[in-house]
């Protein structure tokens, strides 16, 4: 099959979160399965700064935005043996950040990504590349399914192309004022309840959900959750309308990238069959961060955005207990100001068992996964989550809240799991979290049982292989909708 991935970020070119990891790793796995896979994203300043062997192409793209014909240049490079196309427009993409600044999102994001979506379709025709499936990701690409359904419905070039739309995080929907319709080149016929209208605003993700041939999201549990009023972010009714076309496919982990046996950032490599290096990495992490190098004290690691979504409202309440307990807590991340201040205050007070590391430090993250005994993810919601998969791979036993992809990957003996690999709790309360932390600390003291639990986690297979096979099935289903 010819499969085109359209995304606003792709590792290593541009990244703000897990979306970029998925849009790099899944294409690589599909390529290994024999498909003609290509990727397209905007040519941001971040991409330009990174180099990446990018070359100028001979094509250009055009799109009418806000009543004006806007032009963009075509550039290209590769991700391994996968062609990567980039659309350049300095007005829209030559900025310091992808989506906005600390003050908020760029006010013209609707125009920026409308230009990108229209540019993608224009470029495909000029290149004479007819994908069997266009796989779109999150609201920034949401106009593509809608345009193919409404504007390109009679266009023979796209008549046999299936469209899949993947929701990575339903909380970010592309909500804009009604007045932005014309700026995106859309007339008033799009502003209806069965299209983009959403409580008087424009909702781009809603349009994609109603227009795509198939919709996927990034875990089976999250797929069920978003169809409920509690977790549907106002779109549960729309998703219910498309229930038969909505599928949950668990994201995988790039096992080539995340492998303790080959990771050059570790103090000593190790594996499930030769796990001795795990202890060396724990000691190295403790020394690096100024913690007491004690093998019998459990290290709890957190690599996360510091936000309420990630459970930091619970952690904030429990910090005094962490400080008083016989454990070491290592935190790496950046995020909301109130949590940054809390952690910086703890750091300033010199709590000897807490290491706070503010910022984005990619060289430290693997050391935390390798040096931690327990990896903590108490998320309020988590569409899929990669941290728990990395932790399992690196022998850090995950402790998670039972939600989204965390519920699909971490299994607790207390819940009747016959092959437990971690600890989980359900009620989103400080009490439920601390009870589970206490359980994990007790379990850590039984060294024989702990070693078995750790090795069972390291033996789990959450690579992209099974997920890619499932996507193959869904691509074929999308093509069947086109009579192919």
Swiss-Prot record:
The keyword Ribosomal protein belongs to this UniProt entry's keyword annotation: no
GO biological process, one term: glycogen biosynthetic process
MF annotations from Gene Ontology: alpha-1,4-glucan glucosyltransferase (ADP-glucose donor) activity; alpha-1,4-glucan glucosyltransferase (UDP-glucose donor) activity
Binding site for ADP-alpha-D-glucose: 15
Keywords tagged on the record: Glycogen biosynthesis, Glycosyltransferase, Transferase
GO CC field: cytosol
Pathway noted in the entry: Glycan biosynthesis; glycogen biosynthesis
Annotated catalysed reactions: [(1->4)-alpha-D-glucosyl](n) + ADP-alpha-D-glucose = [(1->4)-alpha-D-glucosyl](n+1) + ADP + H(+)
Family matches, as InterPro entries: Glyco_trans_1 (IPR001296), GS/SS (IPR011835), Starch_synth_cat_dom (IPR013534)
Pfam families according to UniProt: Glyco_transf_5, Glycos_transf_1
EC number of the protein: 2.4.1.21
Record family assignment: Belongs to the glycosyltransferase 1 family. Bacterial/plant glycogen synthase subfamily.
Function recorded in the entry: Synthesizes alpha-1,4-glucan chains using ADP-glucose.
Protein name: Glycogen synthase
Naturally occurring in which organism (per UniProt): Geotalea uraniireducens (strain Rf4) (Geobacter uraniireducens)
């Amino acid at each position: 099959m010819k499969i085109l991935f359209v995304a606003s970020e792709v590792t290593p070119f541009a990244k703000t979160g897990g979306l970029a990891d998925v849009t790099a790793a899944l294409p690589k796995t599909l390529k290994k399965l024999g498909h003609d896979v290509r990727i397209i994203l905007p040519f941001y300043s971040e991409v330009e700064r990174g180099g990446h062997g990018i070359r100028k192409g001979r094509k250009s793209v055009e799109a009418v935005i806000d009543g004006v014909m806007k032009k963009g240049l075509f550039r290209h490079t590769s991700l391994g043996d996968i062609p990567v196309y980039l659309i350049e427009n300095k007005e829209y993409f030559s900025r310091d950040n992808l989506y906005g600044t600390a003050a908020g999102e760029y006010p013209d994001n609707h125009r920026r990504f409308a230009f990108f979506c229209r540019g993608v379709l224009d470029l495909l025709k000029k290149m004479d590349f007819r994908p069997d499936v266009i796989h779109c990701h999150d609201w920034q690409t949401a106009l593509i399914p809608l345009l193919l359904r409404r504007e390109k419905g009679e266009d023979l070039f796209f008549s046999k192309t299936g469209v899949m739309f993947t929701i990575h995080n339903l909380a970010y929907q592309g909500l804009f004022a009604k007045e932005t319709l014309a700026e995106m080149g859309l007339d008033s016929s799009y502003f209806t309840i069965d299209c983009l209208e959403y409580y008087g605003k424009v909702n781009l993700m809603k349009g994609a959900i109603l227009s795509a041939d198939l919709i996927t999201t990034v875990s089976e549990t999250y797929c069920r959750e978003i169809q409920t009023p509690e977790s549907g972010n106002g779109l549960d009714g729309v998703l219910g309308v498309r229930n038969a076309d909505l599928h949950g496919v668990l994201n995988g982990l790039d096992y080539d990238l995340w492998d303790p046996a080959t990771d050059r950032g570790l103090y000593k490599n190790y594996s499930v069959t030769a796990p001795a290096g795990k202890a060396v990495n724990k000691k190295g992490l403790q020394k690096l961060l100024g913690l007491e190098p004690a093998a019998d004290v459990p290290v709890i690691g957190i690599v996360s955005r510091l936000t309420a979504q990630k459970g930091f409202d619970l952690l904030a309440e429990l910090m005094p207990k962490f400080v008083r307990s016989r454990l070491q807590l290592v935190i790496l991340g950046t995020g909301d100001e109130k949590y940054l201040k809390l952690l910086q205050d703890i750091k300033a007070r010199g709590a000897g068992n807490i290491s706070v590391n503010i910022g984005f430090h990619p060289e430290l993250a693997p050391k935390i996964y390798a040096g931690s005994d327990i990896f903590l993810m108490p998320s309020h919601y988590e569409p899929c989550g990669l941290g728990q998969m990395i932790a399992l791979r690196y022998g850090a036993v995950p402790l998670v809240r039972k939600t989204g992809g965390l519920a699909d990957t971490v299994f607790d003996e207390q819940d009747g799991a016959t092959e437990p690999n971690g600890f989980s709790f359900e009620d989103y309360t400080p009490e439920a979290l601390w009870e589970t932390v206490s359980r994990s600390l007790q379990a850590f003291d039984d060294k024989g049982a702990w070693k078995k639990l750790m090795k069972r986690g390291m033996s789990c297979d959450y690579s992209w292989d099974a997920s890619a096979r499932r996507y193959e099935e869904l691509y074929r289903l999308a093509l069947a909708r086109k009579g192919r």
